[in-house]
Amino acid sequence: MVLADLGRKITTALLPRQRTVINEEVLQAMLKEICTALLEADVNVKLVGKLRQNVRAAIDFEDMGAGLSKRRIIQTSVFNELCKLLDPGVPVWHPTKGHSNVIMFVGLQGSGKTTTCTKLAYHYQKKGWKTCLVCADTFRAGAFDQLKQNATKARVPFYGSYTEMDPVVIAQEGVEKFKEDSFEVIIVDTSGRHKQEESLFEEMLQVSQAIDPDNIIFVMDGTIGQACESQARAFKEKVDVASVIVTKLDGHAKGGGALSAVAATRSPIIFIGTGEHIDEMEPFKTKPFVSKLLGMGDLEGLMEKVSDLKLDENEELMDKLKHGQFTLRDMYEQFQNIMKMGPFNQIIGMIPGFSPDFMSKGNERESMAKLKRLMTMMDSMNDGELDHPNGAKLFSKQPGRAARVARGSGTSVREVNELLKQYSNFSATVKKMGGIKGLFKGGDLGKNVNPSQMAKLNQQMAKMMDPRVLQQMGGMSGLQNMMRQFQQGASNMPGFKGK
């Protein structure tokens, strides 16, 4: 994600001075670096000037009390001003459960509108909503074929026509059909154009009047940078745009300019597109976004993703964990959960101390491929092996089992043994967790759990981690700090409290 370059430059401007006496001269140098990074990201020069002025006005070295961290105060001030830069200050629309919510997509051709329609349908579908798609784009050749292909891949019901050429008729028929079938989120894709023109706006108005959408989403290409502002204003003047999705933020240096420009029009950005794949779209919330940008993590978002998995509903697994039991089948299910959580980069960026580009796209694909390979090996195991209380011991006593699994999965015995070694490490950690009283009670884990036992668990986790990852987190102290934050977040989340 190229936006991470901006985050890295701002973080670099703030970090090196931690061992330096921070005075007026150092502050000016820091602000210069930060403003240069923002200008390089195509943020409007007036907005950058205002940010610099506000940060400078918020810091008074003479009035600072003794013992206060000047670097922390500057970092907080920069964080707050970046939030102001990206926050339009308008409430975001949310669909209503048990009701047909009609969402109409508008935008220029080539902005990624049709793909984004499917991404949004898939996003709500994963959260338990009954979603569908309507293709009212009759202008672009192949538009219905593209939507049909995307919807089929995402397993989302769709409606369109190869013969009807009136987009208003298609939109009306599709929405009525899906309302009769009690669909909760009905997404209508409309025609785009190569440029803003009256015929486009006229068609959008006709479709809008016919289907009476609850939310009109404007899809915008993030690669045009601050030029997004005039485009967003033009669409807002013609139709009642309530939300914006900015796409293509994974491969262009102008992403910062695009986001700040949209915010300047007071249009709330609800999602950002970070890649071509169906799950490469993230909900946009200003504070968590800036926090991730600066490597400060987003534990609220991480806990939300974990909560979506509904792990607490798996009473059998929770009971096993309490007693320190962990089978190969349990590990397989956890691998499935990891796949459900979405791209690794999104998860990594939510952990404090990690930047969103910690793992490159190539490494991410490689990691997902490795995970799928491990699951393929486990698919070749029988029920007795998957459910054995100590699967690794069973395989070590009978080496022929590993050879059979390798043949069945098209892998080598060495790879099967590596899988079993990973399972042994996981199992050892679970046994330690099972021996810690109060770990599964919920609430304030700091009060429930013996500190020395928690320290041993942290050491066990550190042994399992890639040294590069542990170093990025700030060593053992960084891991312990992250665990404390995670525990505090867990105690405040539904489904993580004791019954």
Swiss-Prot record:
Alphabetical UniProt keywords: Cytoplasm, Endoplasmic reticulum, GTP-binding, Hydrolase, Nucleotide-binding, Nucleus, Ribonucleoprotein, RNA-binding, Signal recognition particle
Region ranges (NG-domain): 1-294
GO biological processes: SRP-dependent cotranslational protein targeting to membrane, translocation
UniProt-annotated location(s): Nucleus speckle; Cytoplasm; Endoplasmic reticulum
SMART domains: AAA, SRP54, SRP54_N
CDD domains: SRP54_G
Domain of life: Eukaryota
Annotated stretches, region: M-domain: 295-499
GO molecular function, one term: GTPase activity
Transmembrane segments: none
Pfam family, one: SRP54
Enzyme Commission numbers on file: 3.6.5.4
Binding annotation for GTP: 107-114, 189-193, 247-250
GO CC terms of this entry: cytosol; endoplasmic reticulum; nuclear speck; signal recognition particle, endoplasmic reticulum targeting
Alphabetized InterPro entries for the sequence: AAA+_ATPase, P-loop_NTPase, Signal_recog_part_SRP54_M_sf, Signal_recog_particl_SRP54_hlx, Signal_recog_particle_SRP54_M, SRP/SRP_N, SRP54, SRP54_euk
Reaction catalysis annotation: GTP + H2O = GDP + phosphate + H(+)
Self-association and partners: Component of a signal recognition particle (SRP) complex that consists of a 7SL RNA molecule of 300 nucleotides and six protein subunits: SRP72, SRP68, SRP54, SRP19, SRP14 and SRP9.
Role played: Component of the signal recognition particle (SRP) complex, a ribonucleoprotein complex that mediates the cotranslational targeting of secretory and membrane proteins to the endoplasmic reticulum (ER). As part of the SRP complex, associates with the SRP receptor (SR) component SRPRA to target secretory proteins to the endoplasmic reticulum membrane. Binds to the signal sequence of presecretory proteins when they emerge from the ribosomes. Displays basal GTPase activity, and stimulates reciprocal GTPase activation of the SR subunit SRPRA.
UniProt remark on domains: The NG domain, also named G domain, is a special guanosine triphosphatase (GTPase) domain, which binds GTP and forms a guanosine 5'-triphosphate (GTP)-dependent complex with a homologous NG domain in the SRP receptor subunit SRPRA. The two NG domains undergo cooperative rearrangements upon their assembly, which culminate in the reciprocal activation of the GTPase activity of one another. SRP receptor compaction upon binding with cargo-loaded SRP and GTPase rearrangement drive SRP-mediated cotranslational protein translocation into the ER. The M domain binds the 7SL RNA in presence of SRP19 and binds the signal sequence of presecretory proteins.
NCBIfam families in the record: SRP54_euk
Entry's family note: Belongs to the GTP-binding SRP family. SRP54 subfamily.
Full protein name: Signal recognition particle subunit SRP54
Gene that encodes it: SRP54
